[in-house]
Curated annotation (Swiss-Prot):
Phosphothreonine: modified positions: 64
Molecular-function GO terms, alphabetical: hexon binding
PTM annotation, UniProt: Cleaved by the viral protease during virion maturation. May cause the middle segment to be shed from the capsid.
Site (Cleavage): 111-112, 154-155
Protein name according to UniProt: Pre-hexon-linking protein VIII
Gene source species: Canine adenovirus serotype 1 (strain CLL)
């Protein structure tokens, strides 16, 4: 009975390459035979069988259809592409310089604080992606109509910003290819239910379950 209800293989993730790093059986689901009677053993087998059916159903729902479990290079069409939302950042201001420029009739185009800015525009949402200036202007709620500052244009504007803002958004680029991210890995590599594991010769065992299997060369390191 234990051979007919196999223990699932749990996949390991290699974040540097975005590929699977082998799979091992989840022995935490094994029965403690020293304290289990026939009734308890039968009950646990029923639970394990139901769990395996749930895992196989989940794999059919979340896995992307493919002929190779872990392709060396995942095409862009099979990868979840992250689309970063526009991010607005408050820029540093130099109010003394701005007032002096206004008094001289100059148009404002930014400014700088006397001390180094402590505003950090580095963000994990922008890591690894191109950025460009956003096409949208800041909300009118950020602008006050007191006529103190002059905006870009030939005549004096009745609107003046209380704070300068910069909007960044992801630049268009070629969709990413390669390995999967951690979020997609959980969906693609559901715990594997390997049915009838002892029904064939050893060479029929899936190589991709072995941690040192190389998907590029289709070989296991240290073995012919």
């Amino acid at each position: 009975m234990s051979k007919e209800i196999p223990t699932p293989y749990i996949w390991s993730y290699q974040p540097q390459t975005g590929h699977a790093a082998g799979a091992s059986q989840d022995y935490s689901t094994q029965m403690n035979w020293f304290s289990a009677g026939p009734s308890m053993i039968s009950h646990v087998y029923g639970i394990r069988d139901l769990r395996n059916k749930v895992l196989m159903t989940q794999a059919q729902i979340t896995k992307t259809p493919r002929t190779i479990m872990d392709p060396p290079i995942w095409p862009a069409s099979m990868l979840v592409q992250k689309h970063a939302t526009p991010k607005t950042i408050a820029l540093p201001r130099n109010h003394t310089l701005e007032q002096a420029m206004v008094n001289c009739g100059a148009q404002l185009a930014g400014g700088r604080q006397p001390s180094p800015s402590h505003i950090d525009i580095k963000d994990t949402m922008l890591a690894g992606t191109g950025i460009q200036l956003g096409e949208d202007i800041p909300s009118v709620s950020w602008i006050r109509p007191d006529g103190i500052f002059q905006l870009g244009g030939g005549s004096r504007s009745s609107f003046s910003p209380t704070q300068a803002f910069l909007t960044l958004q992801q630049a268009s680029s070629t969709p990413r290819t390669g390995g999967v991210g951690s979020y997609q890995f959980v969906r693609e590599f559901v715990p594997e239910v390997y049915l009838n594991p002892f029904s064939g010769p050893p060479d029929t065992f899936p190589d991709q379950f072995i941690p040192n299997y190389d998907i590029v060369t289709n070989s296991v390191d240290g073995y012919d």
